């Protein structure tokens, strides 16, 4: 038995000697035998399974992301699902993963463990955006789902996020219930690694197609796009999952001039072309902005590695490229949805939108002026998903977002979605052109109409390598 509550040095030795651990793990650990500090870092605690799942540095050890810590998480989740849905004939889950190092390995091991516990698995054939995984849970009628991703963390990291049957990240009471089950896994011997291939079904293009068809229904004003289909858009997935769907989605919406950054359209968990794959940072958009200047583009968009967040840039009145922050994007996003819904006579009085408490209050002013219910919730997209779930079948969700660059216009996904967001932001730019404006001028007009707020500042991108 490998009990993971002893002194760190003892646990280190257990991992070296115990037959349950594989040779590669032991080799990695032997290599640090003289580095007391590194041994301590890796073994002084268990990598904690929290309300958002796991996140940590990849490597051998109890405080690292590896097949054993991921295995314990999946075994604990399996035990919880089997207890929670014990009357169900066949429990099923979706397993997705991003571009990170070991993501596909951890996903395949998790699929084996779920199936070893009698749970049917829909495993994506290749990396896919997180929002598509959320969609697949709902579409396939699953009870849960996981995605292996660490969002925009540095390359050394990976992570594991658990979702519930509504396609949203787990909330109370299930989050605590799962944590308790994961904490009960005392040793590697408790993890069922021997998969049952009969219970694993590979999914891919079949789900892509249905998801993209659904995303197309998010478009509010296709005519505006048709009038500006030649608008030049530069997009980068920053080596991540957005490359699988976002250029395709933009073309499906009718945008004919989508330029991608070739060096960043290569799947790579080391993110070699950026310091950090975070679309909030100007530095991550450097290559996209260089391409935009070269071709005189109208709009630049970048999604993070798991394609749930999007950063955008456009030109100001002096022709300089500026970054639009998450608050400003959310403001334009919801301004467009609400005013267009009104203008096109789509409002029934039953609509609502949601923002997190830290997101700009100007959205509330827009909602009030247009007589639409606007809800505030805690920070984190699972709380927006909760508001949607509470009103399921009663009210119509038309959009929401948060200042940390996450937006969602549709209710068939229950997590932030950069696929639909990129398409809708491009549509907003086309609509602005209809009115003889740039995206930047539209933003300024919103400030003039609703009042300038503290996030009014727009960052001009400084030329040069570091952004």
What are the roles of these predicted feature ranges?
Residues 7, 12-110, 201-229, 241:
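An N-terminal, well-structured beta->alpha segment
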Residues 38-43, 47, 158-286, 291-292:
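Gly/Ser/Thr-enriched, mixed-charge loops and adjacent short helices
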Residues 43-63, 150-153, 233, 237-249, ...:
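Conserved phosphate/anionic-ligand binding catalytic regions in large, soluble enzymes, centered on
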Residues 94-157, 256-311:
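N-terminal small/polar loop signature for handling phosphorylated ligands or for N-terminal nucleophile
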Residues 106-114, 157-164, 308-328, 363-366:
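Short Gly/Thr/Asp-enriched flexible loops that form oxyanion-binding sites at enzyme active sites
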Residues 293, 297-299, 320, 340-467:
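Phosphate-binding and adjacent anionic-ligand microenvironments
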